[in-house]
């Protein structure tokens, strides 16, 4: 069985670090630990040492002066080198959720784990487990990444399973009210000094993200544009950057540039439906229903993206938004078949909200004739899904819900005669 060293950098995480380490040990067998503290004054160091002493797990606490994320993660990695077969990275405010099952014998150079945000809407891979033989290194001052020193001789894979790591925002760094502005300034400086084009592109993108997060859409758009200039014309990086760019132009009320960015995002990766979902939603706001319907219909024909082949998967867009937009545009255009298809699809998804349930019920209430003309089995399935609805917070939704159940009781009393 491959041995694993836990490798972290921490500062002032005394209030959460026990929960963090407990969560890790519940999911990963840790044989050794090397954690670097970068200047805690809240007793984080002693909390960590006591935690591992009580569990009989050997390890080392290092003290490093803070410079930047890539530099300090690399120092911590060097401190762990050779202590085990593999090294596992984790942030103090991240948490495993679900059931993780690592292979007993690890062989790849790099293992990606699947992460999600705190509201569980976006899924993406991150490299968290690598060979502990000096074959990998950290790069980047912020939003750093672990990379193989020799890509030709390394291999990378993904840890599949019914789990994810929730990327938290409750650690000490996130208590800084100027975090995103500080990050943007650091990334601007790094961009100006960096000669490596891949890192320069990465800094530009995350600088845009930081300005987005401190509500500076004009500056965010400027940095996304710089990032896009350095990207290839097709693929995931430019697709996601163009989606982000369009969102900032929308905040600036520039509809032409918003749609241009999102159309370019779709053209950069035409197998991906996310940009089309955003376009369809915006066309509804602009009251361009015919075009919006065609865009939404196209989006519904595209496959769900594979998490390991996509930078970030916006799951609600694929599960709900494109079908919701199909339904909204169809209602405006009085296209009953499309509206009915939308409602049936949405009804078969995990419940999202009272508002979406209200929308589904409104369509089905108006299209009872479609239900009657559908197969008996489909009609009963619709009845069962409506009966199972839980998110019924408003009086209007509850009234529609009860009305549909009463109608079903009168209409679908028993199976049709054979």
Where are these regions (language model features)?
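Short, well-formed alpha-helical segments that are part of the catalytic scaffolds
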Residues: 12-28, 32
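Acidic helix N-cap motif at the loop->helix transition within catalytic regions
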Residues: 18, 42-51, 99
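A conserved acidic beta->alpha catalytic loop
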Residues: 23, 36-48, 65-66
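Active-site nucleotide-sugar/metal-binding loop of Leloir-type enzymes
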Residues: 74-86
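"A position-specific structural signal for the A-helix of alpha-solenoid helical repeats
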Residues: 206, 244, 278-281, 285, ...
């Amino acid at each position: 069985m491959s041995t694993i060293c836990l490798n972290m950098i921490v500062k002032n995480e005394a209030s959460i670090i026990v929960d963090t380490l407990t969560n890790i040990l519940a999911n990963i067998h840790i044989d050794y630990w090397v954690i670097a503290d970068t200047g805690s004054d809240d007793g984080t160091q002693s909390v960590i040492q006591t935690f591992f002493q009580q569990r009989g797990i050997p390890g080392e606490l290092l003290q490093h002066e803070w410079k930047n994320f890539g530099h300090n993660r690399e120092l911590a990695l060097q401190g762990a080198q050779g202590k085990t077969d593999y090294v596992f990275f984790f942030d103090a405010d991240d948490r495993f959720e679900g059931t993780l099952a690592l292979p007993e014998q690890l062989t790849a150079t790099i293992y990606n784990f699947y992460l999600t945000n705190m509201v569980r809407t976006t899924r993406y891979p991150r490299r968290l487990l690598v060979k502990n033989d000096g074959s990998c290194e950290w790069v980047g001052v912020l939003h750093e990444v672990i990379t193989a020193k020799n890509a030709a001789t390394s291999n990378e894979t993904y840890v599949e399973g019914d789990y994810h790591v929730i990327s938290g925002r409750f650690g000490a760094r996130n208590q800084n009210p100027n975090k995103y502005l500080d990050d943007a300034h650091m990334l601007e400086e790094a961009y100006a000094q960096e000669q490596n084009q891949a890192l320069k592109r990465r800094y530009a993108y995350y600088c845009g993200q930081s300005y987005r997060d401190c509500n500076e859409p004009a500056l965010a758009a400027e940095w996304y544009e710089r990032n896009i200039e350095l990207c290839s014309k097709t693929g995931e990086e430019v697709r996601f950057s163009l989606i982000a760019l369009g969102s900032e132009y929308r905040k600036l009320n520039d509809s032409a540039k918003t749609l241009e960015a999102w159309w370019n995002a779709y053209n950069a990766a035409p197998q991906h439906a996310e940009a089309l979902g955003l376009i369809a939603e915006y066309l509804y706001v602009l009251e361009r229903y015919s075009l919006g319907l065609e865009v939404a219909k196209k989006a519904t024909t595209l496959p769900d993206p594979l998490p390991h082949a996509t930078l970030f998967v916006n799951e609600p867009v694929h599960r709900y938004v494109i079908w919701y937009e199909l339904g909204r545009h169809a209602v405006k255009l009085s296209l009953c078949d499309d509206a009915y298809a939308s409602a049936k699809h949405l009804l078969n998804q995990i419940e999202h909200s009272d508002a979406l349930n209200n929308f589904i019920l409104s369509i089905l209430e108006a299209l009872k004739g479609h239900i009657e003309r559908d197969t008996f089995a489909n009609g009963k399935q619709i009845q069962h899904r409506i009966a199972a609805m839980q998110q019924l917070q408003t009086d209007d939704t509850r009234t529609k819900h009860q009305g549909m159940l009463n109608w079903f009781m009168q209409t679908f009393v028993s199976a049709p005669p054979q």
